[in-house]
């Protein structure tokens, strides 16, 4: 079992350890990416089924996937910086699964499409996504520190 560095549980900043991804990690990244992409598709599909009219007007499925991914990546990021999670888990969860679940390109595209339809809608989505993502990441970080 790994121990947390001194000061971490009190909220001190940590220096991230470098990720040494190599060809041996590709399988883990691919597997995580496949599951992350499937999870994103499931979230988008659920959003479309639950409220088709709202889904067409506002990309809340993407918003939900990105917020959930921000929360989870903060948890895994905290664990990784603590060295509780090994390189394979980092490749699978962070680069693969969460990298596929959350995509900046989808965020940018939805923000631009919203802006074209209505600058207010585009601004709300773009700003709201950024704020919600940061708040979700902060919640994940604090929850992880509290539980450790």
UniProtKB/Swiss-Prot annotation:
Q: How does it sit in the membrane?
A: Multi-pass membrane protein
The record's annotation in InterPro entries points to: FluC
Residues crossing the lipid bilayer are 23-43, 61-81, 92-112, 120-140
Main localization of the protein?
membrane
Catalytic reaction equation(s): fluoride(in) = fluoride(out)
Under the heading PANTHER family, the entry gives: FLUORIDE EXPORT PROTEIN 1-RELATED
Q: What does this protein do?
A: Fluoride-specific ion channel. Important for reducing fluoride concentration in the cell, thus reducing its toxicity.
List, alphabetically, the HAMAP family matched. Answer: FluC (MF_00454)
List the protein's name: Fluoride-specific ion channel FluC 2
């Amino acid at each position: 079992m790994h121990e947390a560095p001194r000061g971490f549980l009190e909220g001190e900043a940590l220096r991230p350890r470098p990720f040494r991804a190599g060809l041996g990690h590709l399988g883990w990244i691919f597997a995580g990416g496949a599951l992350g992409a499937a999870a994103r598709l499931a979230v988008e599909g659920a959003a479309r089924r639950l409220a088709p009219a709202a889904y067409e007007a506002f990309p809340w499925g993407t918003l939900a996937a990105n917020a959930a991914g921000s929360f989870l990546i903060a948890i895994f990021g905290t664990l990784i910086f603590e060295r509780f999670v090994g390189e394979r888990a980092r490749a699978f969860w962070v680069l693969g699964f969460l990298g596929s679940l959350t995509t900046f390109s989808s965020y940018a595209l939805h923000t631009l499409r919203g802006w074209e339809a209505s600058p207010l809608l585009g601004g709300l989505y773009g700003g709201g996504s950024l704020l919600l993502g940061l708040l979700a990441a902060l919640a994940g970080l604090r929850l992880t520190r509290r539980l450790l």
